[in-house]
């Protein structure tokens, strides 16, 4: 959309991140600097509201594997038009949650400029020319120190949590 020669399209910034790398903090700073909203876990609340599922369902399935390759390319670009089609009704719950999150991400991107942390938002918005994708990486030692400090746990425990989270995220995304 253009207004008076100025591009008025919503700008969307997606932030993928390694656990403990500071991705959420980068997202918060970016959103504050640009004066736009940040979506992270808040996206789960919105998806629950939009879909009619309770919020706990989204929290329990948040960034959990669904036998991915980005969940079979979002279920072959989900030939389910709307949520009333028979294939959707027969789908396992974790698949419905995955689709509901994607739909919410797309709705938010249409509505407003924002920063979205995680939730495969880069893939959900891959066809959006006004989407800028960022990935935050940090050395393992830095991540261990961050997680240890943020969760008030030992560095060994932090390393274990990072390894587990990295595996979960990899199977969710890949």
Listing of model-derived features with the role each one plays in the protein:
Residues 9-12:
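Extreme N-terminal starter segment of soluble prokaryotic enzymes
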Residues 37-48:
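Short beta-strand-centered segment that lines the nucleotide-binding/catalytic pocket of NTP-utilizing
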Residues 67-74, 78-79, 154-174:
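Small-molecule kinase domains that catalyze NTP-dependent phosphoryl transfer to phosphate-bearing small molecules
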Residues 1-7:
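Short, Lys/Arg-enriched N-terminal segments with co-localized hydrophobic residues
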Residues 108, 120-128, 146:
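RNA pseudouridine synthases
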Residues 127-150, 155, 160-163:
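Conserved phosphate-donor/acceptor-positioning beta-strand/loop module used by diverse small-molecule
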Residues 48-113:
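ATP-dependent small-molecule kinase phosphotransfer cores
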Residues 15-28:
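Glycine-rich phosphate-binding P-loop
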